[in-house]
UniProtKB/Swiss-Prot annotation:
Residues reported in the UniProt entry to bind heme b b566: 97, 196
Subunit structure: The cytochrome bc1 complex contains 11 subunits: 3 respiratory subunits (MT-CYB, CYC1 and UQCRFS1), 2 core proteins (UQCRC1 and UQCRC2) and 6 low-molecular weight proteins (UQCRH/QCR6, UQCRB/QCR7, UQCRQ/QCR8, UQCR10/QCR9, UQCR11/QCR10 and a cleavage product of UQCRFS1). This cytochrome bc1 complex then forms a dimer.
Protein name in the entry: Cytochrome b
Gene3D superfamilies on file: Cytochrome Bc1 Complex, Chain C
InterPro entries: Cyt_b/b6_C, Cyt_b/b6_C_sf, Cyt_b/b6_N, Cytb/b6-like_sf, Cytochrome_b, Cytochrome_b_C_euk/bac, Cytochrome_b_N_euk/bac, Di-haem_cyt_TM
Record gene name: MT-CYB
Length: 379
């Protein structure tokens, strides 16, 4: 008799996705981040669900309800910090996953890559709205500053901002709708993940060499299931260490002060995972220009496949591109640092140089390096 996992309509899908899936024999630990992102999403949905049971999305009680969760709910503090730091883990995995895609040329799977970009935007939107919910000082002012950027859109800007706010400032209506969106988006993200995987399984996984691996495939289970489980254990260990030893390491102390529209914090800044984009935004003195640069800093991922000039897919055998890639990583770390600094000399200049370098590497230097490497191949 044929195994039920190969005949049952539902189990058949699981089987083709996770068990009998032919996978390249040489994919490294950089291919673990996809499954780790799935784990992060599950952790976030579960902890978020339990937080939503005790949270109230009203300006008068939001801050108190979060305090209540941490003080009075059984293990509420644990759930709250798992959720807050789980977001940080989510973004670490996201950036590693995208970096892997750029390094090994995975972006040539266009559908998978583009759904991935939509996913990145969706996760960023969810994280931003989630940061507003505790209704602390940084929640309120972060929401005010970021939503205000939409007013830079010509003609409809101001109307658009007031429409999003549901009034003339960030208030009760804004908080309520942000909670509604923050709740629904992760499920939309989960659906997009399914589409992401659907497109990936049309082509099969890439591998570090960038060379087609059809002639050398191994079953996903047990080889990569056990490898993924090791990744899960490492991620859970790191998250647990963070939550139990320094849960506020990545947070902002200002968010322990209830939101006050009459008192602006000295330094308004987002969570660490948005600082690189925030630095790019601030490095342009013009409002509309800054907003465009902010959007382009992520949207630039969509044109990376068009800029692929190399005859090789992966950077594994392309030393010049490798050097540029790691300069890009260092540049992003520099931008992250600058985003958290006050707007004063020398940080302004460093931020502007780093921003120009970010776009230059992707748009100019990497394609040029690829062309040079193509020439070197002929020597």
């Amino acid at each position: 008799m044929t195994n039920i996992r190969k005949t049952h309509p539902l189990l058949k899908i699981v089987n083709h996705s996770l068990i009998d899936l032919p996978a390249p024999s040489n994919i490294s630990a950089w291919w673990n981040f996809g499954s780790l992102l799935g784990l992060c999403l599950m952790i976030q949905i579960l902890t978020g669900l339990f937080l939503a049971m005790h949270y109230t999305s009203d300006t008068a009680t939001a801050f108190s309800s979060v305090t209540h969760i941490c003080r009075d709910v059984n293990y509420g503090w644990l759930i709250r910090y798992l959720h807050a730091n789980g977001a940080s883990m989510f973004f670490i995995c996201l950036y590693m996953h995208v970096g892997r895609g750029i390094y090994y040329g995975s972006y040539t799977y266009l559908e998978t890559w583009n759904i991935g970009i939509i996913l990145l935007f969706a996760v960023m939107a969810t994280a931003f709205m989630g940061y507003v919910l505790p209704w602390g000082q940084m929640s309120f002012w972060g929401a005010t500053v970021i939503t205000n950027f939409l007013s830079a859109i010509p003609y409809i800007g101001t109307t658009l901002v007031e429409w999003i706010w549901g009034g003339f400032s960030v208030d009760k209506a804004t908080l309520t709708r942000f909670f509604a969106f923050h709740f629904i988006l992760p499920f939309i993200i989960a659906a997009l993940v399914m589409i992401h995987l659907l497109f990936l399984h049309e082509t099969g996984s890439n591998n570090p060499s960038g060379i087609p691996s059809d002639s050398d495939k191994i079953p996903f289970h047990p080889y990569y299931t056990i490898k993924d489980v090791l990744g899960f254990l490492i991620l859970i260990l790191l998250l647990t260490l963070l939550v139990l030893f320094s849960p506020d390491l990545l947070g902002d102390p200002d968010n322990y002060t209830p939101a006050n529209p009459l008192n602006t914090p000295p330094h308004i800044k987002p969570e660490w995972y948005f600082l690189f984009a925030y630095a790019i935004l601030r490095s342009i003195p013009n409002k509309l220009g800054g907003v465009l640069a902010l959007v382009m800093s992520i949207l630039i991922l969509a044109i990376i496949p068009l800029l692929h000039m190399s005859k090789q897919r992966s950077m594994m055998f392309r030393p010049i591109s490798q050097v540029l890639f790691w300069i890009l990583v260092a540049d992003l770390l520099t931008l992250t640092w600058i985003g958290g600094q006050p707007v004063e000399h020398p940080f302004i200049t460093i931020g502007q140089v780093a921003s120009i370098l970010y776009f230059s590497i992707i748009l100019i230097f990497m394609p040029l390096a690829s062309l040079i490497e193509n020439k070197i191949l002929k020597w």
